[in-house]
């Protein structure tokens, strides 16, 4: 994602001005023409970083304000991984590694609760297809593997965290186990050097996970 200097300044202004800014206001702040601002806003709106909001009066003339979209907000640095690592370490210190695993398993089950009802009473193959779609919604590059009843994920949404704390994988296993009401075998793991994370669904033994 490449932004010009002016586009970066526009985004930086909008992250501070939650109620939005008009083209007229941008023109005054950045000291460039309204037509130049309009061109930048057209590009940013087209690419999904800003959107038009309410109209407001600016210097006697009505103007449409622009605000950041969720996509626009997410370009700014966040420190979720640092926060998550501190949280994981604190839980391990208080509960031990076993307690951390149990906590992550509970988290996986909780994550599945809003989605699980849609999979109820479906054939296993259909459940697996739906579970893959749910994983994709959560940010995984997941697909059904060639092997029967197997899911491959080619990225890890907890990448750095999982590489430093292998217990984090329990969340994935618990999520899939709860969604599919089946035992899940963690066949391959990127945190251990494999090319993907591979999850084998074992339909005969319910609601357990297995490395």
What are these regions (language model features)?
Residues 25, 83-90, 110, 114:
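A general alpha-helix detector
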Residues 1-70:
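Basic, Lys/Arg-rich alpha-helical nucleic-acid-recognition elements, primarily the DNA-binding modules
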Residues 3, 76, 80, 168:
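Residue-level marker of regulatory loop/turn positions in helix-turn-helix DNA-binding domains and
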Residues 71-76, 158-161, 205-211:
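Short, charged/polar, Gly/Pro-enriched secondary-structure boundary elements
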